[in-house]
Amino acid sequence: MKRQQSFEYDELVACGKGELYGPAFPSLPSDNMLMIDRVIEISSEGGEHGKGFIHAELDINPDLWFFDCHFKGDPVMPGCLGLDAMWQLVGFFLGWQGGEGKGRALGVGEVKFTGQILPTAKKVTYDIQLKRVINRKLVMGVADGRVLVDGKEIYVAKDLKVGLFTDTTNF
């Protein structure tokens, strides 16, 4: 079966409801916590480490929920939301490759913030480069990621880790 190489917003919302590829597919967050508007390209081949990649985008506008509360008089997108978006994309990649279960962020080796996302920005771009994919009893992905705002790199994350779990009771 040939897998789809890009996804629009309505498909990502369907993923959050368990309707994209069924309930076993790892779901994305819904509503305000979905930090992705579209997946531009996803591939299990190529990339910087030869293990695959995913490129995605988020459109920025001054009405996004976080600008009203982070911070009053000094609106900026919380850096943790950009980091979470990268974890969301690693989990989505694992499901897209056939992994099943509930996605959980397992950590990150290093994160550097060198810029910010303001309400005047237009577009955030996510660049995720898979380094390792384990598809056994434990499904896990390790990736490096970058966040760019209007083409300028502002966050870099090394060794983003996401696992898929069929049972999260004792997680």
UniProtKB/Swiss-Prot annotation:
One of its GO terms (biological process) is unsaturated fatty acid biosynthetic process. It comes from Photobacterium profundum (strain SS9). The lineage of its organism: Bacteria, Pseudomonadati, Pseudomonadota, Gammaproteobacteria, Vibrionales. Homodimer. One of its GO terms (cellular component) is cytoplasm. The keyword Lipid metabolism applies. It catalyses: a (3R)-hydroxyacyl-[ACP] = a (2E)-enoyl-[ACP] + H2O; (3R)-hydroxydecanoyl-[ACP] = (2E)-decenoyl-[ACP] + H2O; (2E)-decenoyl-[ACP] = (3Z)-decenoyl-[ACP]. Its main location: cytoplasm. Keywords: Cytoplasm, Fatty acid biosynthesis, Fatty acid metabolism, Isomerase, Lipid biosynthesis, Lipid metabolism, Lyase. The keyword Plastid does not apply. GO terms for molecular function: (3R)-hydroxyacyl-[acyl-carrier-protein] dehydratase activity; trans-2-decenoyl-acyl-carrier-protein isomerase activity. Belongs to the thioester dehydratase family. FabA subfamily. Necessary for the introduction of cis unsaturation into fatty acids. Catalyzes the dehydration of (3R)-3-hydroxydecanoyl-ACP to E-(2)-decenoyl-ACP and then its isomerization to Z-(3)-decenoyl-ACP. Can catalyze the dehydratase reaction for beta-hydroxyacyl-ACPs with saturated chain lengths up to 16:0, being most active on intermediate chain length. This is 3-hydroxydecanoyl-[acyl-carrier-protein] dehydratase.
